Amino acid sequence: QAIEKIVYWLKKAETVAENEAQKAVISKLIRFYETGNLKDFDEYAILWVKDLDSRIDFVNGFTESYGDPLGMKASWESLVNFKDIESTHRTEIISSNAQWFEDHSPVDKAFKKDEVKGVSAKVITAAILGGDLYPSTAIGINLPNSNWIRSHHGSKSVTIGNITDAYNKAAHGNGFNEEFVYSDTEKQLIDKYADLTGELHTDLHECLGH
């Protein structure tokens, strides 16, 4: 019954899709829910990872297996979001300079690659969280999980801007700085730059780390 409700709302979403690419993604996801065929899910994931133009996007499905000790059984989750245009420009700059970061990283040359590319990255605003993503979620997501799809078709990497901002605001005034930061000068620098540097840290992880 739960999956029937998911399909019901996906069919509603299909009628108001942002573009034909997004409509095809939703249609293939519906087919997976109706058949349970993993081939349909793989085809959905490939269509989804190729849709880079839609401003509205989503995650929907049995995605992560963190809760299963064997890492075999995934839990259902959903996230509907829209792109943060201004912040996404920041991630695009980082991603487009992936080779520079690789060349200048402080590791032995034996571990460096001659040619690297940053993953497709953007900053999003979460509009709704469902399933295992509710009530709190990670500050970044990189999907799909299938290595062969990632190898042949790429992956999507996102930083969830409003979640990051909420976590930052919740951390302010918790007494940590007063207890552990050495000087007032450092406290002022943290108050001024901590949120931005935290966002850049996540961007570097999502754009270059993956």
Question: Regions from the language model: what does each represent?
Answer:
Residues 1-190, 194:
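Contiguous, non-catalytic segments that form substrate-binding/exosite surfaces or channel walls
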Residues 19, 200-210:
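Active-site recognition of the HExxH zinc-binding catalytic motif
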Residues 196-198:
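Alpha-helical scaffolds flanking conserved acidic
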